Amino acid sequence: MTTRSKKTATAASRTPEAESALKELFIDELKDIYWAEQHLVKALPKMIKGATAEELKQTISDHLEQTKNHVTRLESAFESIGEKAKPVKCLAMEGLLKEADELLSETDKGTEVRDVAIISAGQKVEHYEIASYGTLKTLATTLGYSEAADLFAATLEEEKTADSLLTKVAENYVNEAAVAE
C-alpha cells in the first residue's frame, strides 16, 4: 500500500472548480452562523430572565457579551475574505431556539427544574456552535484564509469554555437542587 503525504495529495487533487465549490460552502456556513449569533443575542436575555440561580444568570450574561463579540468577529471574518456580511437563516439554530422557548414555557417559573432546562437548551446551542466554528476554522485554513481561521479559533475556544461553565453550574448546584424541589 502506498500513501501520499497530506500536502502532496492536496496539491495534486486541488482543482479550481473544487476550490470554488468549497469556498461557496464556506461562505454559506459563515452566513448561517452569522444569523445564528445575531439571533442568540436576542434569545439569551430570555434565558437570563427565566433563570433562578444567580450563577446561571451570570454565566449566561457573560456569554451574551461574548456572543455580541462573536457577531463582530464574524463581520471581521467576512471582511477579511472580501465578502459582505450577510446572514442567512440557520434552520438548526432556529430549531434549537424554538426548543429553548418551549422548555421555558413548559417549566415552572422560579424553579431549579427550569434552570436545568435552560442549561440543557444552552448546551445544545453551544454544541452546535462548537461544531460550526470547528468546521469554519478548518475550511478557512484549507482555503488559505488565515485571518478568518484565527478569528474562528478564538470563538471556538470561547464556545468550549461556555459549554464547560454550564456543565459546572449544573453539576455544582442546579441538578441537585432540582432533585430536592
Which positions does each model-derived feature cover?
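Amphipathic alpha-helical hairpins
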Residues: 1-181
